[in-house]
Design a protein with these regions (language model features):
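Core catalytic alpha/beta fold that binds nucleotide/phospho-ligands
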Residues: 1-193
């Protein structure tokens, strides 16, 4: 499995979007232009460029992949017809992409002020307690949230079920979480074992 995180979001500008438009498939360009704001367009285009970089790193031949077309499963999750597995995530703090021969999920989230109602809706009792006793509950919540979202992405379903029980049976996955304190975000990568 390989992954890449990009967090120089100051590069989001109209000139960079124009450059990226020339590097993506027609399908991805159409998806990017569905965003009404420049930031969404940038993240959509930049994540595609990052995906191509990672796919080319994984190849055993010198032929470069110039573009890929996504297929979509019944839940709307994108996949590549002939593999490998991939996952893309973005937030205001950055963009994260993972590629693997096994099902993989990645999530990046900016750390923000904890909302108790959201904690009650998304975390089970044990998770809620671990957040409350943590010296930094905002970070503790985001760590758990990214684990849940990355796990569901690995499963290919997205958020379709009770989030409180998401990690109860996650023994089939390896989870790795990174905190970027300087840029104020958390990234979790989950790969099926």
């Amino acid at each position: 499995m390989i992954y890449k995180v990009f967090d120089d979001m100051a590069q989001c500008c109209s000139a960079e979007i124009m450059r990226l438009k020339g590097c993506v498939s027609a399908q991805r360009l159409e998806q990017a232009m569905q965003y009404s704001h420049m930031f969404g367009q940038y993240c959509c285009l930049k994540s595609y460029e990052m995906l191509l970089e990672l796919l080319n790193q994984m190849r055993s031949t010198p032929d470069k992949i110039e573009n890929v077309e996504f297929q979509y499963n019944e839940y709307g999750a994108p996949y590549l017809l002939h593999g490998p597995y991939f996952s893309i995530s973005h937030c205001k703090a950055g963009i994260a992409v993972a590629v693997s021969e096994n099902p993989v999920g990645i999530d990046i989230e900016a750390v923000r002020t904890l909302k108790e109602e959201l904690v009650r809706k998304t975390m089970n009792e044990t998770e809620q307690q671990s957040i409350l006793v943590d010296t930094n509950p905002d970070w503790a919540f985001i760590r758990l949230w990214t684990k849940k979202e990355a796990y569901l992405k690995m499963k290919g379903t997205g958020i379709i079920s009770d989030l409180k029980s998401t990690l109860n049976n996650a023994d089939d996955a390896k989870m790795t979480t990174y905190d970027c304190v300087e840029q104020q975000y958390v990234v979790t990568i989950v790969e099926q074992q």
